[in-house]
From Swiss-Prot:
GO cellular component terms, semicolon-separated: ribonucleoprotein complex; ribosome
Keywords: Ribonucleoprotein, Ribosomal protein, RNA-binding, rRNA-binding
Molecular function (Gene Ontology), one example: structural constituent of ribosome
Protein name according to UniProt: Large ribosomal subunit protein bL9
Signal peptide limits: none
Protein source organism: Bacteroides fragilis (strain YCH46)
GO BP field: translation
Stored HAMAP family: Ribosomal_bL9 (MF_00503)
């Protein structure tokens, strides 16, 4: 019996896979629990159309991320913060401060996609990575200076 999986099933396949299973397993478990549907010609056609639309949508999201990456490519930030006499920052500089500085420059970036490798606790030059898409990321250099 051929079926189309509606969700990931362990040891069988992933969502939208067309797999062959024994009739009893498909009829008595997978289909009643909503994990699969029978792979009729019309269901296969609908699956192909859905996958085509999803691929088109994902391509558009990736192009948008690449456009934002192109805008961020030459950006360099300077973050002024309060510093002790030994050169240590009061607190630390993280993704929130970087997102605020980018917003001042006109780039609205969610702070959750900005990654700073280590805690920035001293004055100096550092790099942050903005992960716009799983395949698109931009490295932004920033410098922490005393106020």
């Amino acid at each position: 019996m051929e079926i189309i999986l509606k969700e990931d099933v362990v040891n069988l396949g992933y969502k939208n896979d067309i797999v062959t299973v024994k009739s009893g397993y498909g009829r008595n478990y997978l289909i009643p629990t909503g994990k699969a549907v029978i792979a009729s010609p019309s269901a296969k056609k609908m699956l192909a159309e859905e996958l085509k639309q999803r691929a088109h949508k994902l391509e558009k999201i990736k192009k948008d991320a690449e456009a934002v990456a192109a805008k961020l490519e030459g950006v360099s930030l300077t973050i002024a913060t309060k510093v002790s006499s030994t050169g240590t920052i009061f607190g630390s500089v993280g993704n929130i401060q970087i997102a605020e500085e980018l917003a001042k420059l006109g780039h609205e970036i969610d702070r959750k996609i900005i990654v700073v490798k280590d805690a920035v606790k001293e004055v100096g030059a550092y790099k942050a990575i903005v992960k716009l898409h799983k395949e698109v990321s931009v490295e932004i250099p920033f410098e922490v200076v005393a106020e």
